[in-house]
Curated annotation (Swiss-Prot):
This is Vesicle-associated membrane protein 7. InterPro entries: Longin-like_dom_sf, Longin_dom, Synaptobrevin-like, Synaptobrevin-like_transport, V_SNARE_CC. Loss-of-function mutant (antisense inhibition) displays impaired receptor-mediated phagocytosis. Belongs to the synaptobrevin family. The modification N-acetylalanine is found at residue 2. The modification Phosphoserine is found at residues 167-168. Its main location: membrane. The chain crosses the membrane at residues 189-209. GO terms for cellular component: apical part of cell; cell surface; endoplasmic reticulum membrane; Golgi apparatus; lamellipodium; late endosome membrane; lysosomal membrane; neuron projection. Involved in the targeting and/or fusion of transport vesicles to their target membrane during transport of proteins from the early endosome to the lysosome. Required for heterotypic fusion of late endosomes with lysosomes and homotypic lysosomal fusion. Required for calcium regulated lysosomal exocytosis. Involved in the export of chylomicrons from the endoplasmic reticulum to the cis Golgi. Required for exocytosis of mediators during eosinophil and neutrophil degranulation, and target cell killing by natural killer cells. The keyword Transmembrane applies. The gene is Vamp7. Residues 7-110 form the Longin domain. The keyword Aminoacyl-tRNA synthetase does not apply.
Length: 220
């Protein structure tokens, strides 16, 4: 479960975006943004196996796409944090900014927050106060049909293999560290076995030779 895509836009004008993996996010997002009214509101659209959560405030839309089993409370917690950071950084400049004007700077913020809210499951317990629960109850979920320019039904296509490069690097690093740890553990175990064996042999020989100085076995 993860936040797959995030975007900040003014109407249909995209100001900043970030994708966790490959997909036709922009094609789908353009249709979603066109359906969002300009007044302040919050809503979740449902389409297939995906959810589109957004907050619209002062004509600026903060939107993210998640799997349908991703907690909505975490999605809106992410959007609220993105909104706060975006407003603090840009303020009224967003009302007249050109397309992608903030992308070079703010896409890294989206990436960091996307990763944080996707991975930190403790947010549910820490941040989901009763007020947030009540607020979430007031945010509706609506089904939405998307149509491509050719008139065909538009589906969100996700290619998570694009994110497997980072995952494979992490896996290799983890495997290497695990192998190193297992090797050290085996070395320590071997040393302990050798020491115990030597002590055991010494005790047996001492018993057979009449004592720890081996008086019956050592010639004077």
């Amino acid at each position: 479960m993860a936040i797959l895509f995030a975007v900040v836009a003014r109407g249909t004008t995209i100001l900043a975006k970030h994708a966790w993996c490959g997909g036709n996010f922009l094609e789908v997002t353009e249709q979603i943004l066109a359906k969002i009214p300009s007044e302040n509101n919050k809503l979740t659209y449902s389409h297939g196996n995906y959810l589109f959560h957004y907050i619209c405030q002062d004509r600026i839309v903060y939107l993210c796409i998640t799997d349908d089993d991703f907690e909505r409370s975490r999605a809106f917690s992410f959007l609220n944090e993105v909104k706060k950071r975006f407003q603090t950084t840009y303020g009224s400049r967003a009302q007249t900014a050109l397309p992608y004007a903030m992308n070079s700077e703010f896409s890294s913020v989206l990436a960091a927050q996307l990763k944080h809210h996707s991975e930190n499951k403790s947010l549910d317990k820490v941040m989901e106060t009763q007020a947030q629960v009540d607020e979430l109850k007031g945010i509706m979920v609506r089904n939405i049909d998307l149509v491509a320019q050719r008139g065909e039904r538009l589906e969100l296509l996700i290619d998570k293999t694009e994110n497997l490069v980072d995952s494979s690097v992490t896996f290799k690093t983890t495997s290497r560290n695990l192998a190193r740890a297992m090797c050290m553990k085996n070395i320590k175990l071997t040393i302990i076995i050798i020491i115990v064996s030597i002590v055991f042999i010494y005790i047996i020989v001492s018993l057979l030779c009449g004592g720890f100085t081996w008086p019956n076995c050592v010639k004077k």
